[in-house]
């Protein structure tokens, strides 16, 4: 297996609402399925695709039970400066997110905070001085 992550699918309660939230953050819808039986939204990001799909349908498709609780996964959005962490957290709050942890210095020498999207998915917004966020959005380990 080649080392690669192609798609992250978030199970959501209301795909239209979740889509509107990510569009309010500046993400651009790249496609999807929208018919009488299903609604899936796809956003192209550098190096991977983010999908939004009904939580129950995703659980069924994955062969697991939807417990509605935290699944032990946190998403991360790396930025170029500590100031950008605070700006992104403010943008997320304005779009409808809850701030779980405001921006603060970390034990590993960076600066990060966490917002929770409307469906309960935690997003860490982080500046790591040892990583590079390139102009095309890729993040690399230095």
Roles of regions detected by a PLM:
Residues 18, 22, 85, 92:
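Hydrophobic pocket/interface hotspot
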Residues 1-19, 74-77, 129-142:
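N-terminal beta-strand motif that seeds the catalytic metal site of vicinal oxygen chelate
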Residues 56-68, 132-134:
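Short, flexible, glycine-rich and Lys/Arg-enriched loop motifs at helix boundaries
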Residues 2, 31-42, 106-113:
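Generic detector of contiguous secondary-structure segments
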Residues 4-13, 41-43, 63-142:
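Vicinal oxygen chelate
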Residues 9-59:
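Core segments of cupin and vicinal oxygen chelate
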């Amino acid at each position: 297996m080649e080392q690669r992550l192609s798609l992250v699918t978030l199970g959501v309660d209301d795909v239209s609402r979740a889509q509107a939230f990510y569009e309010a953050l500046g993400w651009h819808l790249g496609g999807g399925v929208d018919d009488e039986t299903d609604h899936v939204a796809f956003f192209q990001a550098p190096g991977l695709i983010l999908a939004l799909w009904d939580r129950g349908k995703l659980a069924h498709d994955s062969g697991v039970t939807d417990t509605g609780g935290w699944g032990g996964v946190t998403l991360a959005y790396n930025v170029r400066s500590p100031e950008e962490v605070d700006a992104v957290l403010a943008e997320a709050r304005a779009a409808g997110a809850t701030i779980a942890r405001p921006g603060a210095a970390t034990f590993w020498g960076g600066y990060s905070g966490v917002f929770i999207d409307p469906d309960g998915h935690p997003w860490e917004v982080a500046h790591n001085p040892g990583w590079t966020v390139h102009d095309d959005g890729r993040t690399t380990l230095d």
